[in-house]
């Protein structure tokens, strides 16, 4: 199925520098000039919660100061998600000095409860995000222009993209 996404950064950000990870890196560099953010798309883990975490992200997680777990929207199996998110949290804690976890952008009580439980039982900072989508108009619209990986503009024509946060929404997630 063609989902009309021609980029490798946060879906619905108009350009790479406006996705959540790149905006976060820019903010961190104001206070710690050599900060780097390494975005990892682990949607494959969200869709297959039993896949091997180490083979998916292990090489990227070694000796990090902080890992931010920002996922949940692609999780389909909410029955096994509570155990899976706890395993992911423990794995990340074994690799980084500090781990922070966010809730989902799209409100889903079941997923949110699992994330909150994992945060509380592992003494993590939890940052809710669903309020952004509920309170602000931070989704792109049909007809808005985005850019592909070659910086070529294209116009949004499908509804799938407009369920994701736009540049402003990405900024709010980063903050």
Where in the sequence are the language-model features?
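Conserved SGNH/GDSL esterase-like catalytic core that processes O-acyl groups on lipids
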Residues: 2-82
